[in-house]
């Protein structure tokens, strides 16, 4: 016999509410409505704003925590559950959603508005979208992508034979022009190698009584200066392969040359430096004295205001355009100073390297006359050159590894160590685009290495870095 559901009492289930006698028991229909409301609050999409009537506020968007729906009695005994409070709490959750703020939160300032009623449901944004100490949240910018270290090939991409290339520490027999032509002094001859066409041209032959001791290109790459063992300096027009001038003044061999616009500086074993203006008829316009031994290194700064000279007396001097005495004297090196290089990135930054007894690369600030840093390379420093594309420099060395080292400045961390020469690497020059270096040694070879990035890639990386640093979230 079937019983009528309206008259037959139902068994108590765990899902029903346990209410005190003082309250009326909710009907099944009310309980089912509460469950439906809870489900709708749990699974509705927060992406769509819900609008209510202009006179009827939105329940889920209103701040009901500003007043108590169910204030608890202060005379309650600890440990006893108030059934009326539980039911009211459940009802509030069903009607207003599970994320209704508490009154304490509103008082403490967590509520964005002090209004109780709202007429639009705003999309809730979680406070835990980011870690509490996320750098992006703190700074408001996206971190720059981690830059992978640049790969430098450990082997030369080209090797040229250079017979009769002298193994003499005090000479400078290799230079690369702005026209992409390499000049090399081999014995008593000078050869030109065109990097674009790989064509080799014999520029001159000094004869059996003289040898080439130094070569140096003018800035435009149309004229080449040649220092000889007799003390003369010859100026050659490379387009016509013609000697247009021979200048005297030194008594001994000329092992170092440096151009500054129309002024040519020459350093000799006679311990002097001659300043020659090729626009005048005089062989030299001034004579610089200060070194006590052979001049083996000469370099003008990029702004042509200062001339650095290194000698076999272990001294590094700095001269200005008008002085006949050095304006700065650096005496920290313990061996001959041939390796000299001015930074193209920092005004007044000068690097120098010492010979076998010194083995150090030192950095100087010529504007403040200060010694900045010293790096022990553990081998003879034969030559130095800065990259014009990046803040890096290359050093070439002698005993015992005859290595070539690429350094990152100012950390002086080694980016690459290149080996291959069997004799000390005495000669070094950079291509006009700043990407390739050529090294020469007493093993009678010239080796070409790709060590520096191109100017375009470097500028592109700078742009990307700047854009990454300034990137913010678009709202």
UniProtKB/Swiss-Prot annotation:
Compositionally biased tracts (Polar residues): 15-27
Keyword Magnesium: no
InterPro entries reported for this sequence: Cdc20/Fizzy, WD40/YVTN_repeat-like_dom_sf, WD40_CDC20-Fz, WD40_repeat_CS, WD40_repeat_dom_sf, WD40_rpt
Short name of any one Pfam family annotated for the protein: WD40_CDC20-Fz
Expressed in which tissues: Expressed in the root tip, predominantly in the root cap, quiescent center cells, surrounding stem cells and columella.
Pathway the protein acts in: Protein modification; protein ubiquitination
Cellular localization per UniProt: Nucleus
Positions of WD repeats: 166-203, 207-246, 249-289, 290-329, 332-374, 376-417, 420-459
Principal location: nucleus
Annotated stretches, region: Disordered: 1-27
A molecular function GO annotation: anaphase-promoting complex binding
Keyword field: Cell cycle, Cell division, Mitosis, Nucleus, Repeat, Ubl conjugation pathway, WD repeat
Matching PROSITE patterns: WD_REPEATS_1, WD_REPEATS_2, WD_REPEATS_REGION
GO biological process: cell division; maintenance of shoot apical meristem identity; positive regulation of DNA endoreduplication; protein ubiquitination; regulation of cell size
One GO cellular component term noted in the UniProt record for this chain: cytoplasm
Disruption phenotype: Stunted plants. Impaired root growth and smaller root meristem.
Note in the entry: FZR2 controls the induction of early rounds of endoreduplication while the remaining rounds may be mediated by FZR1 and FZR3. FZR1 and FZR2 are functional homologs, and their functional divergence in root development arises from the different expression patterns.
Role description: Activator protein that regulates the ubiquitin ligase activity and substrate specificity of the anaphase promoting complex/cyclosome (APC/C). Required for meristem organization and maintenance of quiescent center identity and stem cells.
Family classification: Belongs to the WD repeat CDC20/Fizzy family.
Subunit structure: Associates with the APC/C complex. Interacts with CDC20-1, CDC20-2, CYCA1-1, CYCA1-2, CYCA3-4, CYCB1-1 and CYCB1-2. Binds to GIG1.
Protein name, as recorded: Protein FIZZY-RELATED 1
Species this protein is from: Arabidopsis thaliana
């Amino acid at each position: 016999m079937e019983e009528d559901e309206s008259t037959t009492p139902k068994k108590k289930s765990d899902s029903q509410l346990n209410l005190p006698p003082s309250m009326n028991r909710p009907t099944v229909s009310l309980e089912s409505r509460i469950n439906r409301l809870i489900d709708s609050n749990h699974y509705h999409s927060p992406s769509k704003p819900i609008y209510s009537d202009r006179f009827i506020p939105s329940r889920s968007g209103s701040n009901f925590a500003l007043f108590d729906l169910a204030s608890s009695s202060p005379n309650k005994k600890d440990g006893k559950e108030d059934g009326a409070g539980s039911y009211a709490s459940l009802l509030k959750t069903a009607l207003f959603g599970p994320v209704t703020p508490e009154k304490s939160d509103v008082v403490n300032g967590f509520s964005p508005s002090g209004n109780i009623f709202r007429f639009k449901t705003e999309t809730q944004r979680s406070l835990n979208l980011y870690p509490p100490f996320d750098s992006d949240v703190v700074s408001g910018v996206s971190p720059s992508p981690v830059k992978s270290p640049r790969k430098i090939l450990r082997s030369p991409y080209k090797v040229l034979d250079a017979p009769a290339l002298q193994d003499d520490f005090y000479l400078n027999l290799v230079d690369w022009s702005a026209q992409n032509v390499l000049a090399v002094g081999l014995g008593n001859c000078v050869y030109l190698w065109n990097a674009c066409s790989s064509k080799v041209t014999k520029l001159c032959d000094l004869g059996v009584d003289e040898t080439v001791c130094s070569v140096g290109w003018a800035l435009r790459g149309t004229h080449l200066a040649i220092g000889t063992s007799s003390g003369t300096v010859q100026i050659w027009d490379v387009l016509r392969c013609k000697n247009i001038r021979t200048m005297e003044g030194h008594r001994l061999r000329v092992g170092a040359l440096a151009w500054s616009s129309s002024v040519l500086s020459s350093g000799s074993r006679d311990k002097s430096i001659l300043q020659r203006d090729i626009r005048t008829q005089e062989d030299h316009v001034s004579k610089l004295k200060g070194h006590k031994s052979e001049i083996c290194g000469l370099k003008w700064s990029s702004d042509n205001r200062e001339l650095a000279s290194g000698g076999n007396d272990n001294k590094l001097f700095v001269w200005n355009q008008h002085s006949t005495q050095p304006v700065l004297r650096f005496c920290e090196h313990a061996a001959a100073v041939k390796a000299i290089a001015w930074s193209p990135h920092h005004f007044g930054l000068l690097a120098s390297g010492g010979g076998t007894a010194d083995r150090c690369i030192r950095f100087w600030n010529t504007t403040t006359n200060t010694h900045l840093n010293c790096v022990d390379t553990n081998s003879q420093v034969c030559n130095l050159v800065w990259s014009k594309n990046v803040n890096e420099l290359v050093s070439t060395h002698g005993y015992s590894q005859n290595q070539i080292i690429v350094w990152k400045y100012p950390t002086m961390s080694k980016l690459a160590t290149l080996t291959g020469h069997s004799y000390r690497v005495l000669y070094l020059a950079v291509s006009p685009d700043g990407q390739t270096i050529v090294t020469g040694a007493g093993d009678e070879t010239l080796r070409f290495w790709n060590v520096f990035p191109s100017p375009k890639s470097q500028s592109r990386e700078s742009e990307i870095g700047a854009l990454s640093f300034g990137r913010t979230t678009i709202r």
